[in-house]
């Protein structure tokens, strides 16, 4: 079993409050989870309104497939 992780540090320019940031992050996480069948969550900077840290994890039998899936997530975000 191969487990791959991806850590994204995102700057959100159009966010002007924590509520707006959380709405944007919720949309991103939902689309990433549904499109790529990975686990994703906001893992850092929860109190900053223009910055977010997202963690993504994928599991598979083949390293190339896991790496490719995480590369697609990175390009998508």
Report residues per predicted region:
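Short, charge-patterned binding micro-sites
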Residues: 3, 41-62
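C-terminal structural segments of small proteins and small subunits
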Residues: 60-77
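N-terminal first-folded block
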Residues: 1-35, 39, 76
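Residue-level signature of transmembrane alpha-helix interfaces in integral membrane proteins
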Residues: 25, 53-55, 71
């Amino acid at each position: 079993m191969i487990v791959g992780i991806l850590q994204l540090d995102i700057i959100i320019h159009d966010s002007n409050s924590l509520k707006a940031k959380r709405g944007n992050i919720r949309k991103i996480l939902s689309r990433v989870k549904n499109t790529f069948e990975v686990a994703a969550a906001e893992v850092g900077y929860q109190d900053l309104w223009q910055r977010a840290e997202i963690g993504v994890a994928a599991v598979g039998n083949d390293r190339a497939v896991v790496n490719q899936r995480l590369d697609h997530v990175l390009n998508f975000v």
